[in-house]
């Protein structure tokens, strides 16, 4: 075990004194028969800017450390061999290159000020996909010259975290520099897993930057939130996305040279318009578009069709978005379970916001099912809450459960039609909205109001047999008006009518 004056060598795992650690490491570097694997960057100096995947334990958790910047003589060769996705290559290298989130990283941004004052402590970054959470965390590490470790809650165990904590404490002891741990999808950790960060954060031994797309109030421990201020990253504007895409085109032009196709402004405008502020999705769509254009000229319509067919893009703000949710709603209304599941899957697998679908199902429960099955509204409301608490991808079955129940439920639009009749009546009869309320059903909280006749003559229904009384509730000016279950002529579907005729 390594004590206060001892540390474990990251190469051979041998425990040596702090005074002997550097000579001990030098012996490994000079030994030509040493390990063939790269030495951990644990003890290296402040010359790291990019990220290298490595393992921190035998569990092989996906952890990223900062790696050395290549020398100028090798830079050109590295660029040609760079096979990272465009979304990764286009990440900004400094806060000045960062696009969007002016309130956080602009000239007077709160996070920029904290960095400049060297007071950047643990925090939670909350924002939708593609708003720049990971990029911001990496820039904080580079700007503060901190050791940076990137992990994901989907693939990291508690044992991995404990190993990282141990290494971080040793690193702090040796260098005096803290480690920034970027925990992506922090909401995927359960509350017990989140608790292991509390002592490390509280003592300031590590800086935790957690990223989440879910509401921290529902998904994170209150103890963790109290120690990590929450910063909200707003959805990128269309102009923000255009700026990012234009910069990416320049990078691709430098990389591809003469083989870089011409990307028309209309393509940039289209991608930035339909990706709904998701920079990662926009860059992926741009990369795919460039790949298609390199094979030959294509029109904007061809690009649109290929992107949608490939599921690289789901139009969350345009026609596809509204057409799909409309088809889903109508399939539920028509009690077609298969179509309901199809359109639900099409939306979720293409990146639709699950809460948007859940909200629509709450509406369906009242609009299309209503009093035919009053249990559907509580079910839909519970589904919305469950999706908030669980998040994707686990929430997919929860949404499917509710969707199938709604499709199979009996249908009634009596409430929907009745309230529409009220709205139409008030719109066409402006005076009806100011009609005098009958005195006997008015509120009479004071003696003066009672003396004026408020509440006088009111018959309290529970005091009467079966609650039946002769009593008027509507204002005199609209007495006798009917809204509920107005007579309506129901049509018979011609195809069903013909089918009945054919079977006779």
From Swiss-Prot:
One of the record's GO molecular function terms: DNA binding
Stretches of the chain forming a coiled coil according to its record: none
Residue spans of biased composition, Basic and acidic residues class: 79-90
UniProt: ATP binding residues: 129-135
CDD domains referenced in this protein's UniProt entry, alphabetically: AAA (cd00009), HLD_clamp_RarA (cd18139)
ZnF segments: UBZ4-type: 6-33
Keywords for this protein: ATP-binding, DNA damage, DNA repair, DNA replication, Hydrolase, Metal-binding, Nucleotide-binding, Nucleus, Zinc, Zinc-finger
One annotated Gene Ontology cellular component of this protein: nucleus
Region (Disordered): 55-90
SMART domains according to UniProt: AAA (SM00382), ZnF_Rad18 (SM00734)
Biological process (GO), any one: UV-damage excision repair
Cellular location(s): Nucleus
Keyword DNA repair annotated: yes
Signal sequence residues: none
Protein residues bound to Zn(2+): 9, 12, 24, 28
Recorded family membership: Belongs to the AAA ATPase family. RarA/MGS1/WRNIP1 subfamily.
Record's function text: Functions as a modulator for initiation or reinitiation events during DNA polymerase delta-mediated DNA synthesis. Has an intrinsic ATPase activity that functions as a sensor of DNA damage or of arrested replication forks and regulates the extent of DNA synthesis.
Xref: PANTHER family: ATPASE WRNIP1, WERNER HELICASE-INTERACTING PROTEIN 1 FAMILY MEMBER
Name used for this protein in its record: ATPase WRNIP1 homolog C26H5.02c
Naturally occurring in which organism (per UniProt): Schizosaccharomyces pombe (strain 972 / ATCC 24843) (Fission yeast)
